[in-house]
Amino acid sequence: MESNSIDLIHTSIPFGNHYEYSANYNDFGHNQNTDRFFEQMDFLTPELLRVLKPGRVAAIHVKDRVLFGNATGTGMPTIEPFHAQCISHYMKHGFQYFGMITVVTDVVRENNQTYRLGWTEQCKDGSKMGVGCPEYILLFRKLPTDRSTAYADTPVAKS
């Protein structure tokens, strides 16, 4: 793709190794851990910055991940702050972070999939209970060529 040719990037990246999108082991979803995932993203993210027009927006959809205690060895569910890791990752590659939109999700549906917030667990020990995880749209900009006004090189103007 040509440099500085894309007006908007809006994508939902894989959430580390949370989902497998295909059986292909070269797929972004096939990673041993979050560190390996971001090693793969280190190849993609500079390309996103390169093709985005100066001053334009990249909107990245992410979600924090529930880590189950039987997998982590803690014995209790914890939350991996994946959205915070993504903010650091994109900033490391030159994107300017300027906001986050919270996407409220259906906690009942999430509970039905994981059984971690159920009444039976509450009755055993309420201190174990967590909360449902919302999703986020992280907002980044590529710096414009002229930084004195913060306007994009090709402005998005209302007519």
Regions flagged by a language model, labelled:
Residues 1-159:
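Core catalytic lobe of class I
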